[in-house]
């Protein structure tokens, strides 16, 4: 239809871009150039990445660092302790007892020690030499200084043990180490070899308390009070204090003051008298006397008739402990 209408494009549809044809061509070429550059850059990136991957796959890993070995500590062996000896070594030597002084009530043997712990008790045992007798030692391992026979005229061969070892026993003895005038007093002691003695239990002992005025016989832990009061030594002639033992029990008819009662002789002697009654011993004892109270004697323990009757029943070797 002709007339005054607007011209349309082909198909009657208005074009979307009304730019000039030359400008459109130039824009297309720029896009292609950018695409080529991008592809080239991508190729370079892939090439570099591939090289890195190949290198990572082909290069050997560094060897692992070896861990420092932990030093082996060898344990120090614990030394085996040396056994502590339980006593003195045995002595198997033979000795001629005939060459040694005899331990008896009259003996004075300076080589033997006096009791250094008179306030102590005993083991509750007694020792008696075998029939051949026993050498007596001041110290185990030294040469013997005396001999203790199996039997003695005035007894005293059954002795209480105050210390016991496997091979040795320490005992109380009759006799003296010296005399009071020379400054020596106290209960005599010595060591015996265990192989030279027979050992037995004696569970009886006598305990005297001067201050309490009591005499007890102790047997198996049970105490029996000896009846009556008793007398003891004066200040000048005191009763010996400490441990000793019953040497013998016998009657002395020549001593009228005993009225015929037996005397219980003790091993310990006076701490102040060298002798008594014209002889060179100053033995102490339990004995009867009509007057038996207070500090009036020469060291003996004077008792009444009932008391001496009971005391004479204890066997030789019975331990006696006298306290102030």
Where on the chain are the PLM-derived regions?
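Gly/Pro-biased beta-strand-loop elements
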Residues: 187-287
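Exported/periplasmic cell-wall-interacting domains
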Residues: 75-83, 175, 199-203, 250, ...
């Amino acid at each position: 239809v002709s007339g005054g209408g607007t011209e349309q494009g082909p198909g009657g549809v208005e074009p979307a871009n009304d730019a000039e044809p030359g400008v459109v061509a130039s824009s297309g070429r720029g896009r292609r150039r950018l695409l080529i550059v991008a592809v080239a850059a991508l190729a370079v990136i892939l090439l570099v990445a591939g090289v890195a991957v190949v290198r990572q796959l082909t290069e050997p890993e560094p060897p692992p660092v070896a861990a420092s070995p932990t030093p082996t500590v060898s344990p120090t062996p614990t030394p085996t302790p040396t056994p502590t000896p339980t006593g003195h070594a045995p002595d198997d030597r033979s000795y001629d007892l005939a060459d040694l002084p005899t331990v008896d009530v009259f003996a004075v043997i300076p080589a033997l020690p006096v009791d250094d712990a008179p306030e102590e008790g005993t083991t509750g045992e007694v020792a008696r030499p075998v029939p051949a007798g026993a050498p007596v030692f001041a110290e185990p391992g030294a040469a013997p200084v005396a001999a203790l026979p199996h039997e003695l005229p005035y007894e005293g061969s059954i002795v209480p043990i105050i210390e016991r070892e496997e091979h040795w026993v320490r005992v109380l003895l009759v006799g003296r180490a010296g005399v009071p005038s020379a400054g020596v007093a106290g209960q005599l002691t010595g060591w015996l070899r265990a192989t030279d003695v027979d050992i037995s239990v004696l569970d009886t002992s006598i305990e005297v308390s001067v201050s309490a005025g009591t005499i007890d016989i102790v047997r198996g832990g049970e105490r029996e009070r000896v009846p009556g009061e008793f007398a003891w030594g004066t200040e000048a002639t005191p009763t010996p204090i400490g441990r000793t033992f019953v040497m013998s029990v016998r009657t002395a008819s020549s001593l009228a003051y005993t009225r015929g009662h037996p005397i219980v002789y003790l091993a310990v002697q006076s701490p102040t008298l060298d002798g008594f009654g014209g002889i060179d011993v100053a033995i102490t004892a339990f004995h009867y006397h009509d007057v038996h109270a207070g500090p009036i004697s020469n060291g003996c323990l004077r008792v009444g008739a009932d008391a001496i009757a009971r005391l004479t029943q204890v066997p030789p070797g019975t331990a006696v402990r006298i306290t102030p």
